[in-house]
Amino acid sequence: MQKLKQQVFEANMELPRYGLATFTWGNVSAIDRERGLVVIKPSGVAYETMKAADMVVVDMSGKVVEGEYRPSSDTATHLELYRRYPSLGGIVHTHSTHATAWAQAGLAIPALGTTHADYFFGDIPCTRGLSEEEVQGEYELNTGKVIIETLGNAEPLHTPGIVVYQHGPFAWGKDAHDAVHNAVVMEEVAKMAWIARSINPQLNHIDSFLMNKHFMRKHGPNAYYGQK
């Protein structure tokens, strides 16, 4: 688990580096599916003092199996997503400014251009709000459930992120670093969409044929972007 703990530590340290986290906000996790264990950031520990050894290992029920600290308060959300979507290898939650603004507005981040289409196949959805009963009950677990409710049976790696109404963004990927990469992109396209709609409030979505081209050339069966 030491290698995975190091990877998760490095991915968490990318959050303040890319301007996605202030103070102790944000958390990254990764899963070892063979062992059924998840490594996640400890709750409330400052990035300035955090070490790889501080990462917390939990089983799929949330029980701590390794680590001196309590795991992130969002652990139950991460675990629910891992249970539902086997393709996920890493998950990140932030309160990055522009993506969170769309979450607070209760709006999906619209697909307006090719930067968005390179990573997200369509709008980045916004969940419904949680009921008072859902918040007062198992809040973090129910946050995971409302994300799953919104995504349904869609392949999560085709839209590797979501904004939770009145809360903030979650992103995911093949591993922890990929999840952070997608979170960075989500913040950038959220900012671009806000600026573009400010310039032209009547702006429509990207043409579907252009979106399809950009997404498929990176992620489709005949993808040709980048090096083999």
Curated annotation (Swiss-Prot):
Gene Ontology BP terms: L-ascorbic acid catabolic process; pentose catabolic process
The protein's Enzyme Commission number: 5.1.3.4
Cofactor note: Binds 1 zinc ion per subunit.
Inducing or repressing factors: Induced by L-ascorbate. Repressed by UlaR.
Family matches, as SUPFAM superfamilies: AraD/HMP-PK domain-like (SSF53639)
The protein's required cofactors: Zn(2+)
InterPro entries referenced in this protein's UniProt entry, alphabetically: Aldolase_class_II_sugar_metab, Aldolase_II/adducin_N, Aldolase_II/adducin_N_sf, UlaF
GO CC term, one of those recorded: cytosol
Positions bound to Zn(2+): D74, H93, H95, H167
Function, in words: Catalyzes the isomerization of L-ribulose 5-phosphate to D-xylulose 5-phosphate. Is involved in the anaerobic L-ascorbate utilization.
PANTHER family assigned to the protein according to its UniProt record, in alphabetical order: FUCULOSE PHOSPHATE ALDOLASE, L-RIBULOSE-5-PHOSPHATE 4-EPIMERASE ULAF
Protein name as annotated: L-ribulose-5-phosphate 4-epimerase UlaF
Originating species: Escherichia coli (strain ATCC 8739 / DSM 1576 / NBRC 3972 / NCIMB 8545 / WDCM 00012 / Crooks)
